[in-house]
Amino acid sequence: MRSRFSAFALGDAGYLLRSWHPTTRPAELTLDPDVRWYRLDIERTERGGPFDTDGVVEFVAHYKGAERGSLHEVSRFVRDGRDWFYVDAVTADRRA
């Protein structure tokens, strides 16, 4: 999860696509260059440990762009071997 936030902050769409599960991954991903992601708050996690094959992360990611705001998301991940992949999420946008 933290590596995906870092990829958003750095504008690394390639990493985001590579870490997205193939069953839900979009064909392409365009990031807004005017949005700056600057803080990640992990609210809770479920599973996702060294012996788990899936996990859930609830977080709030804060950004600045034309306006300041935050993205509140509950994301699902699955493990394939040593690697974790983002599957999907439920979001609730909030203004800061």
Enumerate the predicted regions with their spans.
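Core segments of small alpha/beta cavity-forming domains
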Residues: M1-P33
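Aromatic side chains
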Residues: F5-F8, Y15, F59, F77, ...
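A short, structured loop/turn motif at beta-sheet edges
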Residues: L10, R47-T53, R79-D83
